[in-house]
Regions:
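Nucleotide-activated chemistry modules centered on ATP-dependent adenylation/adenylyltransferase
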Residues: 1-167
């Protein structure tokens, strides 16, 4: 999926809706950054996505300059500064429209928000302080790391090191 049809598949899903809404622009959020170029085989890349056009619509591969942790930092900072909760939907495991808060992507997002001094509960992710033990066990015993997940978790780890005064 990632190496061949990721971007075009997502854009293909957006095309009928863009047509119905008479939209001339579709944004696809970046999965990786320019520093990841060539390291991770992914068919969702600005050199491909930005050239996909259909009907009167063009595609913009957005946020390529930001890591996932940078994006979490920006969202967290905005939500705290504006005193507005923002419900994120990051989970692909849950079929009910909410985050399961038990999968790798939910855990990664929870930890990323905590690293930015945010409260995951304000972002649609259920979290209690004692959940950190469950997450730690998951990372240690169940998580199968690959080149992609290692980079994401290292960014989170780096933010915790930078924000050592987090309560």
């Amino acid at each position: 999926w990632h190496g061949f049809q990721h971007g075009i598949g997502l854009i293909g899903h957006a095309a009928p809706l863009a047509y119905l809404l008479k939209s001339n622009l579709v944004y696809i959020a970046s999965s990786f950054t320019s520093k990841d170029a060539g390291k991770v085989p992914c068919a969702s890349d600005p050199t491909i996505d930005n050239f996909v056009r259909f009907a009167n619509c063009q595609t913009i591969h957005d946020g390529y300059e930001f890591t996932r942790q940078d994006k979490i930092r920006n969202i967290t900072k905005y939500a705290i500064g504006q005193n507005k909760p923002i419900e994120l939907r990051v989970c692909w495991q849950s079929s009910g429209g909410k985050n399961c808060c038990k999968c790798e992507k939910c855990y990664r997002t929870i930890m990323g928000i905590l690293a930015e001094e945010g409260d995951p509960n304000s972002f649609g992710l259920s979290y209690k302080k004692e959940d950190s033990h469950t997450i730690k066990k998951f990372i240690k015993y169940k998580l199968k790391m690959n080149s992609v997940s290692v980079a994401y978790w290292q960014d989170i780890q780096q933010r915790f090191l930078e924000n050592q005064d987090i309560k």
